[in-house]
Amino acid sequence: MSECAFAASNLTAMKIIDIRGILNMEPVRGGTDEWYWATDYIHGDLYEAEELFRDGHPVKSNRLYLIHYPDGAVYEPVPPVDGQYLGYPVYDGGTVALLAVNFAEQVIRILRFSQQQETAREIAKLPLSEVKDCYNLILHTSPLSLTRQPNDGTFELIWPERASFSLSSRESLNFRDGDKLCFNIWYEDPDYREEMLVRALPDGRILERFPGDIRIMPNGERWLVR
């Protein structure tokens, strides 16, 4: 954990957040105002890093930092290891879940980080052969799930259970709600608009559709914006 200091300024007192010059800090997905994250994208995203590895290039781990609000404490929950690359984190049940793929060892690791422990603990380990590639390999909630949406009109649930079904290329998963998956879909006909599609697991059949977008708020409430 790095120390957070106050610096004198002609404008006002400022809290210094030292994350090695990485300026792309943003909120962790999943409805929290408590956690932010930043990474250096040294090889681009997870899929781009995988392509480099498959082409025989060395892959260094990206550095991923979690920043806690309001105290400004900075954590590096997963130590960098050559051949490893980190995906997007997500907030789940009071902890931050992290995705780490080790191309050298051919494994996918899912980890949880809590501020009390200050280190991430592994909760699942899968062979990398479980997926064709890491294109759109992302963690979602809730419950915590590993999903993949390749650019071929299919959706895959990889963990904790398996499911696969067809969907529109204009759909993207917003969140999971038990045995239901809530997708955003956009249209241009000709005006731009968005809808929510609620699909059932495991077959993906559509249960509901309605205009708007559901946002998960910091207190866990879901707001339908329309």
Which role does the model predict for each range below?
Residues 71-97:
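Blade-loop segments of beta-propeller domains
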Residues 36-40, 97-100, 145-148, 182-185, ...:
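Residue position within the beta-strands of beta-propeller blades
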Residues 135-143, 148-152:
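Long, charge-rich C-terminal accessory regions
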Residues 134, 169-170, 178:
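Low-complexity, Pro/Ser/Thr- and charge-rich linker/hinge segments at domain boundaries
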Residues 2-25, 48-80, 104-130, 147-173, ...:
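Surface-exposed loop/turn elements that mediate protein-protein interactions on large endomembrane-trafficking
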Residues 32-35, 93-94, 141-144, 178-180, ...:
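Short coil/turn segments that connect the beta-strands within blades of beta-propeller domains
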Residues 26-44:
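N-terminal "first-domain core" detector
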Residues 29, 90, 138, 174-175:
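Conserved beta-strand position repeated across blades of beta-propeller domains
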